[in-house]
From Swiss-Prot:
Residues 167-189 are annotated as: RP domain. The gene is CAMKK1. GO terms for cellular component: cytoplasm; cytosol; nucleoplasm. ATP binds at I134, G135, K136, G137, A138, Y139, G140, V141, V142, K157. Activated by Ca(2+)/calmodulin. Binding of calmodulin may relieve intrasteric autoinhibition. Partially inhibited upon phosphorylation by PRCAKA/PKA. May be regulated through phosphorylation by CAMK1 and CAMK4. Its EC number is 2.7.11.17. This is Calcium/calmodulin-dependent protein kinase kinase 1.
Length: 505
């Protein structure tokens, strides 16, 4: 593409696009020449730079994708590490194979300029060539996006700000850390759009091997859309529930280790997910599970989120979340319960509590004991862990730190997981980062995308072929494995949504 525009074909709007693209090129180049930010407390290596041509402008330098070997440094390979070496397969999360979340990963792209071109079968937004639609939903659509300079595909989500703001922000959260509220003073009241930008600023800085990565956000202040670019995980959900072929106990153990580390990282960042389930656990090309979909998540102050409303997927809800007591409940304990249901699904291919009717399902969750089928047979240690995770009393339910030490998880101590200090560092967001959490698109340019990307309103799993979606019934009888809390349309397992209360300190 050297010497020519990065467009699919020539268009009558090309001259206007070129003129807009040429604005502030000098400022743009100066902005690109700034110091490289650190990632998760680790200084990045020098970046290789690759030219990407923007219509009507000089070549703009974009970061080249780092090699995989630069990002997969095992915690146990550190000289100071104390973990035992172990032989493990490509999906192992044991000592010899776990990828360090603190190893450098490429920073979130900051787009200082946007150029759009349109053709009958192609739309290009900056360096992204938008391809097939891979998901549709109540809040927007998901398109496959190809970055030519990196030769890499991403998932671009186009979200409706009107629908987001109708639900008072996505995900809803209290004021940022360090505010007066955190110091015992009066809480700062945030406008809905401010909440959106603050949460985007947090999500952009989350950097963990077991959490889906947000790459870039673009915003058109005069139009209804936010454009979010995420890592594309082609393998999709780790499991569809129900299924006839559940995982072996060993495979379930390896996947659970990934989920627990990702969950501990989120809790360290003071985020409760609130919708852990197999369809929100996506499998990366490296064989590791990554937590996705923060549509009903909450961020909290203090040690834990104190919640008072129900959200998430009925079959994965904890007893206290569906209680009529009116009392607040622990956000962390909710995540542990949902992870326990997920672990049960891993080994049995179905949820522990199933019913066609929501009230009957709630009654079973609150009152009935966990039943272990005769087939497949599982170990007593695994049964012990499941029962502790599905303890109906949140006060006595096992926590993430104790799950990490459980004999079934560690193979009786032979394969310990890294400590919180080794794989978590707290993300802090400054006011400047919140202000710059999105890049603005000139309003006239997005008319093309509005017409080409917002044609349909209902959607399913963005990583699932359409034919398969039509053939497969919903995940559970009565659609009780489908997320609650959305008044308009369905929701993809990986599309952000917005239906939550405020988390109390």
């Amino acid at each position: 593409m050297e010497g020519g525009p990065a467009v699919c074909c020539q268009d009558p709007r090309a001259e206007l696009v070129e003129r807009v693209a040429a604005i502030d090129v000098t400022h743009l180049e100066e902005a690109d020449g700034g110091p490289e930010p650190t990632r998760n407390g680790v200084d990045p290596p020098p970046r290789a730079r690759a030219a990407s041509v923007i219509p009507g402008s000089t070549s703009r330098l974009l970061p080249a994708r780092p090699s995989l070997s630069a990002r997969k440094l095992s915690l146990q390979e550190r000289p100071a590490g104390s973990y035992l070496e172990a032989q493990a397969g490509p999906y192992a999360t044991g000592p010899a194979s776990h990828i360090s979340p603190r190893a450098w990963r490429r920073p979130t792209i900051e787009s200082h300029h946007v150029a759009i071109s349109d053709a009958e079968d192609c739309v290009q937004l900056n360096q992204y060539k938008l391809q097939s639609e891979i998901g549709k939903g109540a809040y927007g659509v998901v398109r496959l996006a190809y970055n030519e300079s990196e030769d890499r595909h991403y998932a671009m989500k186009v979200l409706s700000k009107k629908k987001l703001l109708k639900q008072y922000g996505f995900p809803r959260r209290p004021p940022p850390r360090g505010s007066q509220a955190a110091q015992g003073g009066p809480a700062k009241q945030l406008l809905p759009l401010e909440r959106v930008y603050q949460e985007i600023a947090i999500l952009k800085k989350l950097d963990h091997v077991n959490v889906v990565k947000l790459i870039e956000v673009l915003d058109d202040p005069a139009e209804d859309n936010l454009y979010l670019v995420f890592d594309l995980l082609r393998k999709g959900p780790v499991m569809e529930v129900p299924c006839d072929k559940p995982f072996s106990e060993e495979q379930a153990r390896l996947y659970l280790r990934d989920v627990i580390l990702g969950l501990e990282y989120l809790h360290c960042q003071k985020i409760v997910h609130r919708d852990i389930k197999p369809s929100n656990l996506l499998l990366g090309d490296d064989g590791h599970v990554k937590i996705a979909d923060f549509g009903v998540s909450n961020q909290f102050e203090g040690n834990d989120a104190q919640l008072s409303s129900t959200a998430g997927t009925p079959a994965f809800m904890a007893p206290e979340a569906i209680s009529d007591s009116g009392q607040s409940f622990s956000g962390k304990a909710l995540d542990v319960w949902a992870t326990g249901v997920t672990l049960y699904c891993f080994v049995y291919g179905k949820c522990p509590f199933i019913d066609d009717f929501i009230l009957a399902l709630h009654r079973k969750i609150k009152n009935e004991p966990v039943v272990f089928p005769e087939e497949p047979e599982i170990s007593e240690e695994l049964k012990d862990l499941i029962l502790k995770m599905l303890d109906k009393n949140p006060e006595t339910r096992i926590g993430v730190p104790d799950i990490k030490l459980h004999p079934w998880v560690t193979k009786n101590g032979e394969e310990p997981l890294p400590s919180e200090e080794e794989h978590c560092s707290v993300v802090e967001v400054t006011e400047e980062e919140v202000k710059n959490s999105v890049r603005l698109i000139p309003s006239w340019t997005t008319v093309i995308l509005v017409k080409s990307m917002l044609r349909k309103r209902s959607f399913g799993n963005p990583f699932e072929p359409q034919a398969r979606r039509e053939e497969r019934s919903m995940s559970a009888p009565g659609n009780l494995l489908v997320k609650e809390g959305f008044g308009e349309g369905g929701k993809s397992p990986e599309l952000p949504g917005v239906q939550e209360d405020e988390a109390a300190s």
